[in-house]
């Protein structure tokens, strides 16, 4: 049975209370990968995977998840500024559907609007060369996406319950 693909909050309900999450930023040529600590407080970069065949990319992601005892994935979903989903979002959803067939770890979708732009501005501000930026942008975007998701989950978990 394929893994569930859900909005972040619904996916979080499927994940155990503790355990690392793998954050993914699907670029056009690469996949940025980040990982959280088991308590889900901090995202750190893992690597940038250069797109090859889907099965090879998926095998690498599953290996990384296994090495880190991950309990789920957070996949950046590139929503347009008006809230609609364009071709990149459709491509991301197709990747998620195909990847879900290979794992039972729930996949949470997280709005990644402007993540790459924010990361690029930060790298430029830190005087990172254009060549170096091209090599690390998707990994840094994966960190940005995963950290945003972790922060959102922390806020929701800290909110007083009304039930």
From Swiss-Prot:
Q: What is its EC number?
A: 3.1.-.-
What terms describe the molecular function in GO for this protein?
nuclease activity
Location comes to: Cytoplasm
Which GO annotations describe the biological process of this protein? rRNA 5'-end processing
| Nuclease is among the record's keywords | yes
What's one Pfam family the UniProt record gives for this protein? RuvX
Question: What does the entry list under GO cellular component?
Answer: cytosol
Q: Which residues cross the membrane?
A: none
Q: Which UniProt keywords apply?
A: Cytoplasm, Hydrolase, Nuclease, Ribosome biogenesis
Protein function = Could be a nuclease involved in processing of the 5'-end of pre-16S rRNA.
Quote the PANTHER family the UniProt record gives: POLYNUCLEOTIDYL TRANSFERASE, RIBONUCLEASE H-LIKE SUPERFAMILY PROTEIN
Q: Would you identify the family this protein belongs to, as annotated?
A: Belongs to the YqgF nuclease family.
Protein name, per record: Putative pre-16S rRNA nuclease
């Amino acid at each position: 049975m394929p893994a569930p693909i859900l909005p972040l909050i619904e996916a979080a309900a499927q994940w155990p209370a503790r355990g690392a999450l793998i954050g993914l930023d699907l670029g056009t040529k690469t996949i940025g990968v980040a990982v959280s600590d088991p308590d889900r407080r901090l995202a750190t970069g893992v690597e940038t995977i250069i797109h090859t065949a889907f099965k090879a990319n998926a095998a690498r992601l599953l290996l990384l998840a296994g090495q880190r005892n991950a309990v789920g994935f957070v996949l950046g979903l590139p929503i347009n500024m008006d809230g609609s989903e364009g071709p990149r979002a459709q491509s991301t959803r197709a990747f998620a559907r195909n990847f879900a067939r290979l794992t039972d770890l729930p996949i949470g979708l997280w709005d990644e609007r402007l993540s790459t732009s924010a990361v690029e501005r930060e790298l430029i501000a830190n005087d990172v060369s254009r060549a170096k930026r091209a090599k690390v942008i998707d990994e840094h975007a994966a960190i940005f996406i995963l950290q945003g998701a972790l922060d959102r989950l922390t806020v929701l978990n800290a909110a007083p319950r009304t039930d």
